[in-house]
Amino acid sequence: VRLSDEQLLQLRFCDLQLKLSGSALERRLQHIYGELQRRGIGLRPHMWLAEEWFSPDGIPGIAVPFYLAHPRLMQLERHQMKQVEGGNANWLRRILRHEAGHAMDTAYRLRYRRAWREVFGPPGKPYPDIYMARPASRRYVHHLGDWYAQSHPTEDFAETFAVWLKPHSDWRRTYAGWPAYDKLLFVDELMQSLRDVPPLVRSRVHVEPLGDNRITLADHYAAKVARYGQYPPSDADALLRRVFTCRPARVAAPRASALLRECRTSVATAVALETGVDRYTVHQALRRAIGRCDELQLRVRGARRTGLRDARTMLVKLVGLLATNRVTSIKL
């Protein structure tokens, strides 16, 4: 029986009766094991279903969000959050490499090494609710969105590890001349020293597993939307309102966010070439524009071709704002 969104939201996580073992999702997740093996790393992080992505302190494993276990739940996630984190193969592997970095840190107690702390900073530093990112900084790698490596020393390590682990990663050329290069070189040398070394921490505990979770999906999404669902007002709003519209007469027009999502690759590539700004920053600008278009309920003003042209012009200006902005605040 296919349940409506309203019916699904009334269920508790434990009512979903989802299983990872033997599933198609498990086979997709295990791709990370091959990447680790090719690097000579003996760790195989165990995985389990939970509310969200995380790798718990003290446990060298990876919690995987429940919605990836079923297409209908992925659809619900998209309806609620406008996106599915890890919902395609490339995004899934990027997240897994990041979480594998956390698992490596735990399994080999890396953060307790003096050299690690000298490179990445104090691991005991409190996690901020909001971190101040510097988009133009070259002291950090670019992997997940929102300059995530800048949020905390342990995230800096996990992001650096992820860039290093990626198959055919050309990090030596990409980051040549960046201070972040020294971090990658440190990770490369550290991982070479750990080749075929068994993990020190081998716990296989599942933290906050889905089967024990009695929270309803409605409560889960209410909290998640409150925390992540809104992009704050920004300098971009004036640009977006100039290109798109929220006039009642255009309610039947395509959503601006849908247009930007549809053409994101081609527009981002063109803008990166035109401005000379790195593709990572361009994609962050576009992602934020899409989020604000959703919040402001903006629509395409005229013909689709005109909308695409104006969107490209808008993104060029928005990238300029972001690239020259010394600090931008981001909610964790």
List the predicted regions and their residue ranges.
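Pan-zinc metallopeptidase signature
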Residues: 1-3, 8-11, 157-331
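Metalloprotease/metallohydrolase-associated module, dominated by Zn2+-dependent proteases
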Residues: 2-7, 11-20, 27-36, 40-45, ...
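A structural signal for short, well-ordered beta-strand segments and their strand-loop junctions
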Residues: 46-48, 105
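Active-site recognition of the HExxH zinc-binding catalytic motif
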Residues: 90-110, 158
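A short linear boundary/processing microfeature
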Residues: 110-111, 122
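Beta-strand-dominated extracellular/periplasmic modules and repeats
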Residues: 114-115
